């Protein structure tokens, strides 16, 4: 079963990008319209890599940094394309 959240904050960029791609495909196939990507706050390296990947991914309609009660800069909220 696919969760509505992917936690990448303990991953390296090299580990995170393939996992993110697979997760977005799985979430789309599971029918999710919105998912959360947890990348942590840290130095922002992982967040920047996730942002680059989301900009080019064909299943991503839009994305934004999490709000005050969503994890703020440690989380990205992703809206997926419609099926």
Enumerate the language-model features and the residues they cover.
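Long, charged, low-complexity intrinsically disordered regions
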Residues: 1-83
């Amino acid at each position: 079963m696919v969760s509505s959240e992917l936690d990448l904050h303990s991953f390296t960029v090299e580990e995170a990008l393939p996992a993110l791609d697979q997760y977005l495909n799985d979430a789309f196939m599971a029918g999710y319209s919105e998912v959360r990507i947890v990348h942590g706050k840290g130095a922002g390296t992982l967040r920047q890599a996730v942002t680059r990947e989301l900009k080019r991914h064909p299943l991503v309609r839009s994305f934004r940094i999490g709000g005050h009660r969503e994890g703020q800069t440690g989380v990205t909220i992703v809206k997926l394309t419609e099926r």
